[in-house]
Amino acid sequence: LPRQPVVFRREQREQAATDSVAHLLDGATGIWFGGGDQARLTAVLRGTATERAIHRRYAVGAVVGGTSAGAAVMSALMITGDERRPGGERRDTTTAYMTIARDNIVTDSGFALLGGAIVDQHFLRRKRHNRLISLVLERVPHLGVGIDESTALIVASDGQWRVNGASAAVTHNAKSARVRG
């Protein structure tokens, strides 16, 4: 049977906290997170009845996905998109993430739907290797996946990953890395 889409506006945390909104997901076979600001998305949904409903649906086989910020929220440790700069200087987008450095990536809690990896998005197009490498070197789970634009990482129920789309997904595995200094 065809289902009607449920559109949820991210700025409405009060609604996300209600059982009546969470129940809109009852029976959902697919849940999609659009782009925007991943920190804002998690601030609205984290710890609410709606987030719990998303996890329940996922646990029984619903497909959960997202683009851009919607992909970033999938991991337990989420990249917010902000970079710490020495002395509080403003981030220069032309030189952002030019180096691999300790404690320069701002993170928050994501929805933990993709276990065991940190997700980064727009990866190749925006040259985010150093950002993800910096993070996987210092933070558990020490595995990162960078998904490029117009590309999807499909995670099967058995945990196997498959890439589909116009570009690629890149993994950085630092589980055996040793960092000096």
Model-derived features: positions:
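C-terminal and late-domain segments of enzyme folds
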Residues: L1, M78-T80, R84-G181
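N-terminal beta1-alpha1 cap of cysteine-dependent amidohydrolase-like domains
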Residues: L1-G35
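Catalytic-core regions built around general acid/base machinery
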Residues: L24-G27, G47-G61
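Catalytic nucleophile loop
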Residues: W32-G35, Y58-M78
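Short, active-site-adjacent cap segments at secondary-structure transitions
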Residues: Q38-A39, A71-M74, A152-I154
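Glycine/threonine-rich flexible loop motifs
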Residues: Q38-G47
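Glycine/Thr-rich phosphate-binding loops of Rossmann-like dinucleotide-binding domains
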Residues: L41, S75, D82
